[in-house]
Amino acid sequence: MALYELFAHPVERGYRAGLCSKAALFLLLATALTYIPPLLVAFRSHGFWLKRSSYEEQPTVRFQHQVLLVALLGSEPGGFLAWSTFPAFNRLQEGHLRVPLVSAREEDRNQDGKMDMLHFKLELPLQSTEQVLGVQLILTFSYQLHRMSTFVMQSMAFLQSSFALPGSQLYVNGDLRLQQKQPLGYGGLDVRYNVSVINGTSPFASDYDLTRIVAAYQERNVTTILTDPSPIWLVGRAAEAPFVVNAVIRYPVEVISYLPGFWEMIKFAWIQYVSILLIFLWAFERIKRFVFQNQVVTTIPVTAMPQGELYKEHLS
């Protein structure tokens, strides 16, 4: 009757030596060289600790219906028309004040509960002798992020265009993009910039100076800007026709930079450490097997006895 091998298992062999022997010292050294160098290699590879991370999020953006407009005229030096939604600013303009017709509509194109774009239109009435050569426009927004930390701020889109020829309409189509000078936190509530971009209650003209408004805004570490506006300046205005500003501002998905939390840093470091450690475990396992099998250090080889045989020997 032919016999076949149906099952097999390796015979475990142990190696005994004193705690103060060369074999014990070698095993201690091999263990240290197995676990410590992978940590040093991962650390020295620059990127062991995750100092900054990023994620994508569709921000919650809402137009606050706050507008500040300055239209530059070419009829006389220093000529301009101005208007805003702030009564204190309008009172300061005196003869330069001109009230436009404004309409604004926000649109949620993908029906996810968050607005995706703003359609803004402003019609500024002009006299037949008035000609517009440039426009400065500020629109303010409420800007919120919720995925990691809850970040709330009041931001703005600043548009400035000037041309050599008098225009009848300015068309703008751009994105309201987030700009970060420093990463956000990974959790908590951040409302440090949840303050008005324009101090609309101030009676002082200096608080409405565009240079000061933009300079103070740029001091923030987190801002929004209107990117790729692609302004189109249309010329040829009828005598009684208004000057029109047409703007389409999209609220795109943003890549948010943030400071990772403790456990995220540990997870990232652990993955790097273990990937290198596996190589060292494989290498030193074979080194230890060679050293003990060939008696490079003096030990007493002992063949491990199966559990059943140990039990029988104990009973006898």
Swiss-Prot record:
A Pfam match: TM231
Membrane topology summary: Multi-pass membrane protein
Superkingdom of source: Eukaryota
Annotated transmembrane regions: 23-43, 262-282
GO CC annotation terms, alphabetical: ciliary membrane; ciliary transition zone; MKS complex
Compartment list: Cell projection, Cilium membrane
Name of the featured protein: Transmembrane protein 231
Organism of this sequence: Bos taurus (Bovine)
